[in-house]
A protein has these predicted regions:
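Register position in tetratricopeptide repeats
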Residues: 29, 63-64, 97-98, 131
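Conserved N-proximal alpha/beta basic substrate-recognition cap immediately N-terminal to
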Residues: 151-161, 169-275
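ATP-grasp fold ATP-binding core
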Residues: 256-260, 265, 283-305, 324-339
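Phosphate-binding site of ATP-dependent enzymes
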Residues: 306-402, 406
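C-terminal active-site "lid" helix and adjoining low-complexity regulatory extension at the edge
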Residues: 408-412, 421-475
Length: 475
């Protein structure tokens, strides 16, 4: 075995940094990540400038949720290799994930100044511009990044034959975050961008298709195009585009709100020209809305471009702060508990089964797990842990049965539901679609109770993919 050979060679030549680097890479490929981490540090002890060791170390730290350490490793990479477009691009991506978008933008631009063909830097800029509501600039960067590469192939690190997964996505926001879901020791991933791929061209070889286009409000045209592409395959499809297409906020409000023991707020989508050129307040009132109400831009998540309008007179100012060509109005439902806190639950559904992901508790109406009062409040984490341990017991039989009806109605192989409970124990649905992210918890020990539930979800997705992929093989 090559690993044994390298360890013997390093005994004879302990300063051989390239052999030490090869050993670290093999350990990583075998999934022995703790040993790989230590091995990369050993490479850097021998050669502090080693590009591959710095980069791979940062990737490992990122995958472990050690964001601060990963940022430090990438910072060293850029300092020691200032003329590397790859170094600047990787550093920028982690900066963006850390919410430092101005710094990320500067490093993406530096990468493109070094090498204008760096596709991933264009992709990163597109994401930043999109987050800021500048869709014209975002579209320009996407086209620069994707036009010549509509299909990319991931590295397979396993042994034997992989399960080949064709992932359908779009050039920008609206995709299901899949980074944590695929194991490159089991699956070989081909990622295809709908909209840049010739529909008459044969699809890349695959055993199963994972439709990662998850946002029906933002990606209706792409979902329709994906449906047409799938006419060229007989392989099983995870999340058929037709099923995703009917999960927009307005459509969900109507069909889920009709279910027993499910409450959905009123939703309506308005073109901006209607609200900007007429009296917005009158248009909203004519559609049955009062104040307070919520306004959000379609296609954005995690609280972006999502605001509460307290009174009728605040409407024009609120609208002026939002980008985009359309706005969704949402009736505000006050779901505060008796203690004054808002509680938002999230479940993930995989192959029809319900998995609890988190319970966020916050004084703020706009509840998001990692922005909620979870770090400072151990009693909130205790509630979260209780939900993860026994979701049916926490939600109650009435609410859990309503969740099962929601999951059956969605008919998604992979998706999620964000919801609260009203005083009668009914489910109040905020969002139900395929875009829900399953994020491994940070490395801090206070989140240890969350690791097993997250691992169970990821394992369920991988099991579903493997089973569907193997089912399509001959014999």
């Amino acid at each position: 075995m090559r690993l044994d050979e390298l360890e013997l060679e390093l005994v004879l030549d302990p300063d051989a940094s390239e052999k030490a680097f090869e050993r670290a890479c093999i350990l990583g490929a075998l999934g022995r990540n703790d040993e790989a981490l230590h091995a990369y540090y050993e490479v850097l002890r021998r050669n502090p400038e080693h590009f591959g060791a710095l980069n791979n170390l940062a990737v490992l730290l990122t995958d472990r949720g050690s964001q601060r350490s990963a940022l430090h490793a990438y910072e060293m990479l850029v300092e020691r290799h200032p003329d590397s477009a790859i170094a600047h691009t990787h550093f920028a991506s982690v900066l963006r994930d850390a919410g430092r978008s101005d710094e990320a933008l500067a490093h993406y631009e530096r990468a493109l100044a070094i090498d204008p063909t760096t596709a991933s830097a264009h992709h990163g800029l597109a994401s930043i511009f999109s987050e800021r509501g500048d869709e014209q600039a975002a579209t320009r960067e996407r086209r620069l990044g994707y036009t010549h590469r509509p299909v990319t192939f991931g590295r397979f690190r396993g042994e034997g034959d992989p399960v080949r997964v064709l992932v359908l996505g779009v050039d920008g926001e609206g995709n299901i975050p899949t980074k944590s879901l695929f194991d490159d020791r089991v699956f070989a991933i081909a990622s295809l961008l709908v909209g840049f791929y010739d529909a008459e061209q044969a699809l890349p070889p695959h055993d199963v298709v994972f439709n990662a286009i998850g946002d029906a409000d933002r990606c209706a045209l792409e979902l329709t195009a994906a449906n047409a592409l799938l006419a060229h395959t007989s392989a099983p499809v995870i999340n058929p585009p037709a099923n995703v297409l009917v999960t927009g906020r307005v459509a969900n409000g109507e069909r889920l709100g009709a279910l027993e023991d499910v409450v959905a707020p009123r939703f309506a989508i308005f073109p901006r020209w209607l609200l900007d050129r007429t009296q917005a307040e009158a248009a909203l009132e004519a559609s049955g809305f009062g104040w307070p109400l919520l306004l959000r831009v379609p296609g954005y998540h995690t609280g972006q471009h999502f605001i509460k309008v307290e009174s009728r007179g605040d409407t024009a100012t609120a609208l002026a702060s939002l980008p985009g060509a359309a706005v969704i109005a949402i009736a505000f439902l006050d779901t505060r508990s008796q203690d004054g806190n808002f509680r938002k639950y999230r479940i993930i559904t995989v192959d029809g089964k319900i998995f609890p992901l988190h319970l966020a508790v916050s004084r703020d109406w706009k509840v998001h797990y990692f922005s909620a009062d979870m770090v400072e409040r151990p009693e909130h984490r205790a509630e979260d842990a209780a939900f993860l341990e026994d979701p049916r017991g926490v939600i109650g039989e009435r609410g859990y049965a309503a969740l099962e009806r929601i999951v059956a109605t969605l008919a998604l192989d992979y998706g999620g539901v964000d919801f609260s409970l009203d005083t009668e124990g009914r489910v109040v649905v905020f969002e139900a679609n395929a875009t829900m992210i399953v994020q491994p918890p940070p490395s801090d020990a206070i989140w240890d109770y969350r690791r097993k539930p997250v691992d169970q979800i990821i394992a369920a997705v991988r099991s579903m993919l493997r089973e569907r992929g193997l089912r399509s093989l001959p014999g």
